[in-house]
Amino acid sequence: MAFKDTGKTPVEPEVAIHRIRITLTSRNVKSLEKVCADLIRGAKEKNLKVKGPVRMPTKTLRITTRKTPCGEGSKTWDRFQMRIPKRLIDLHSPSEIVKQITSISIEPGVEVEVTIADA
C-alpha cells in the first residue's frame, strides 16, 4: 500500500494560550500607574489580548492611638492611615511571552503577583 502525497504540510502543534492575571499593589499611585502603563504597552507591542487595568477598591488601614504615653492629661488622639491601591491586568497569551513582558524594570515599592490559568 502506497501513501499518497496530499501536498499538505504537517500541522504544527499550537502553543497553549493561558489566561494570565497580573495583580499590582503599591502605596504610591504614580509608580503603580507607571508600571501598569509599561506592562500594557509591552503586551500591545506583542499583539496580545489585554483587559485592564481594572482599578480595585483602595484598602485603607487605620491606627488610632493616644498621644500621651502615660495616660495623663487631655485625651488627644493621633490618627494614622495607609492607603493601598490595587490594579488587575488580564492577558491571553503563552506563558513564555509573559516572561518577556514582565521582565521590564519595575518601580521600587510595587508588588507584582502573576497568576496563570488555562484559557
Curated annotation (Swiss-Prot):
Which residues are annotated as modified residue Phosphothreonine in the UniProt record? T9
Cellular component terms (Gene Ontology)? cytoplasmic side of rough endoplasmic reticulum membrane; cytosolic small ribosomal subunit
One GO BP annotation here? Answer: translation
The UniProt record lists the Glycyl lysine isopeptide (Lys-Gly) (interchain with G-Cter in ubiquitin) crosslink at K4, K8
Enumerate the InterPro entries for this protein. Answer: Ribosomal_uS10, Ribosomal_uS10_CS, Ribosomal_uS10_dom, Ribosomal_uS10_dom_sf, Ribosomal_uS10_euk/arc
The record's note on quaternary structure and interaction partners says: Component of the 40S small ribosomal subunit.
Q: Would you tell me the protein name for this molecule?
A: Small ribosomal subunit protein uS10
- Say which species the protein is native to: Sus scrofa
